[in-house]
Amino acid sequence: MTRTFDIDYVLANISDQDKIALLSGIDFWHTHPIPQFNVPSVRVTDGPNGIRGTKFFAGVPAACLPCGTALGATWDRDLLRRAGELLGDECIAKGAHCWLGPTVNMQRSPLGGRGFESFSEDPYLAGVAAASMIVGCESKGIIATVKHFVGNDQEHERRAVDVIVTPRALREIYLRPFQIVARDARPGALMTSYNKVNGKHVVEDPKMYDLIRKDWGWDPLVMSDWYGTYTTIDSTNAGLDLEMPGVSRYRGKYIESAMQARLIKSSTLDARARKVLEFVQRASRTKVSEVEKGRNHPEDRALMRTLCSNSIVLLKNEENILPLPKNVKKIALIGSHIKTPAISGGGSAALKPYYASTLYDAVREALPNAEVLYETGAHAHNMLPVIDRLLSNAVIHFYNEPMTQPNRKCLGTEPVTTTAFQFMDYKLAGLNRALFWSTLIGDFTPDQSGIWDFGLSVFGTANLYINDELIIDNTTKQTKGTSFFGKGTREEIGSMKLTAGQTYKIRIEFGSANTTTMKTTGMVNFGGGAANLGASLRLDAEEMINRAVKAAEDADYAIICTGLNQDWESEGFDRPHMDLPPVGIDKMISGVLDIAAHKTVIVNQSGTPVTMPWASRAKSIVHSWYGGNETGHGIADILFGDVNPSGKLSLSWPIDVRHNPAYLNYASVGGRVLYGEDIYVGYRFYEKTGREVLFPFGHGLSYTTFAVSPEALVSPGTFTPENPSNATVKIKNIGGAAGAQVLQLYVAAPNSPTPRPQKELQGFEKVFLRPGEEKTVIIRLDKYATSFWDEIEGMWKSEAGVYEVLIGTSSEDIVARGQFEVNQTRYWSGL
């Protein structure tokens, strides 16, 4: 039943201790209740591409949507609104009142560990995409939490790094998506970032709170990122409403003490408590499930399949290799991702999916009569693949004593289906969460004979035994790695010769986080601990490549599907380079292209760009991001023409990592990172410097052809902030297939005395057309279409002059032009 309470009455009658309790979570995912005043606890939940629920370990399966950059690549407001609605429904099923998403940080560099979570390098596209999803989610009565405000654009030293950025770049690039969200969606919550901006942690910077609440007139609940509160007095006085997670580290008795010293006023406490009560009241109006459960409805699966296929970008299609015919007699499926799809990046985005469709199965469905030749070709993992399908009868036992303690008492047992686990939010009656031990035991039955490599990484301590023989010691001596939000060890490797079909008893003896012998700073300690055990048959790399080349040569067509996965793109660390995994993938692709380029399709899976040294020799390249539950089906729908590709790159694709605008100023150096590229992020930089890219921002091909009228009619011809202009063009499908085109409107200020980008995205429309169909399309501008941030005046400025309207099918392919005039220079603040 939905609870009701009167906020004014509650504030007037509860104690200061109750008010203080409201200002932090009660645990990892819940706010603090006040039962005597009918104030309930409400649940928040990750993540950016799905609703995990309250459990990292033994969680309830969930819908996994495509990653943020994939969703941005749809350029489809309505489809993204429907995606938000699905996330709202998933929250209700998981008993959650608040979704901790979406993410709208900027991809300054292709190396950002969480770059895949955000929508685009362009602030306008990112803001519009985020607003669309928020509107959909909140239409279900679920509060959305836009994050991370602001400048959390890298993982390296993210809690300590000081982002040095000009006021202009801060406003035009990094704050702009949040501003669009505030104007168009007004979500109920905002999450602060871990980092500093220009000398002060955002979470305790009064200027940042004044910006959203006074300048923008938007007053959401503001919560910290998890363990992202660093002070009591400064953060409370600045405007932070809710410290997460609980139990509080900086509030509670510390606020009491600060109030006694009159360092925090009673009125400030009331303001913070009121905002939390408003949040709880709004959230608790929606009836959510009392127990966490899944949905997995047919209509949800259909929507996720559409999201996946509509995000996929056809980068190259020489000789019209695609779509592939369905009467193929023999097809080669090559690559690490054929049978193990990359459905999401790592960290907060990771969850237990309802299912994950594979490209192997999807191709078999599309070509039921074809002979399929499958080869791995080259591995793409950075850590050995987790053991799942070869694991049986696996459980984890929990103890308050180590394995050396005789007759220790088992406090509980959980069944498991994989050899990866995180205990950060795990609860068990009697278990000492500060210090505990567990034992995973299970049966491992290899499907091939030979030497098997096992890899074990841990946050805590762990040893691997096979048939009671110690194979890996990750307890005695530990070396820091990047796993588990940067708190884990590197992967320690052991090996054993195994026989196919024979069952081996595997055992992991695990000690919780506080047993670790490593000392790490600057990383979030989520507690509980975690471990990951992977395994792989040791194979000869050259033989794998040779087998892949032979399969491609023998087949009518070959599909290579490879790329990155959450080993390479994840919260907690940044990518070390822009290359594909350095285990022979490029060599394998080149070998196949040497003999079968004319009949080979290359499908890349990654959330951000990768180098493609073989791109000029490939005839057909498809980029499919991280596609969620329906990854395999979505890719197959494109490859066989069931869906006409309409995705457009949400990121520029540089040829080389050294070409990207943040190359010289990315990682934290001396505790700070200089945003030296200023406003020239992404295509703004490449165009300003004349730097060639492999594929431009907004690029994406189709199986049909569109004709656009070369003249864009702009009306009114005189642009004012109160009455912005619109551009009208005609577009016709002159090809033989139904399809969609994205008309991208860029505005240029060629005669401005102020340094400006060559052009900037200021509007777009996605248009669906049947063969022969023609439509008139209106693309609407807003008052910011001509403006920039004037650092001297501290206001937005629209300069008088003539502006060009450039309508393209990518940032490089301009197909229609127009112009308008601003006859008077104007300034303004706010939204």
Curated annotation (Swiss-Prot):
What is the phylogenetic placement of the source species in the record? Eukaryota, Fungi, Dikarya, Ascomycota, Pezizomycotina
In this chain the PA14 domain maps to 389-549
Give a GO cellular-component term: extracellular region
GO MF entries: beta-glucosidase activity
Task of the protein = Beta-glucosidases are one of a number of cellulolytic enzymes involved in the degradation of cellulosic biomass. Catalyzes the last step releasing glucose from the inhibitory cellobiose.
Q: Name one Pfam family in it.
A: Fn3-like
**UniProt pathway:** Glycan metabolism; cellulose degradation
Top-level division of the source organism's lineage:
Eukaryota
What residues make up the catalytic site? Answer: D225
| Gene for this chain | bglH
Where does it localize? Secreted
> Into which family does the record put it?
Belongs to the glycosyl hydrolase 3 family.
User: Can you say what this protein is called?
Assistant: Probable beta-glucosidase H
Q: Which reaction does it catalyse?
A: Hydrolysis of terminal, non-reducing beta-D-glucosyl residues with release of beta-D-glucose
List the InterPro entries.
Cellulose_deg_GH3, Fn3-like, Glyco_hydro_3_C, Glyco_hydro_3_C_sf, Glyco_hydro_3_N, Glyco_hydro_3_N_sf, Glycoside_hydrolase_SF, Ig-like_fold
What are the annotated glycosylation sites? N13, N474, N514, N604, N629, N726, N823
What keywords sit in the KW lines?
Carbohydrate metabolism, Cellulose degradation, Glycoprotein, Glycosidase, Hydrolase, Polysaccharide degradation, Secreted
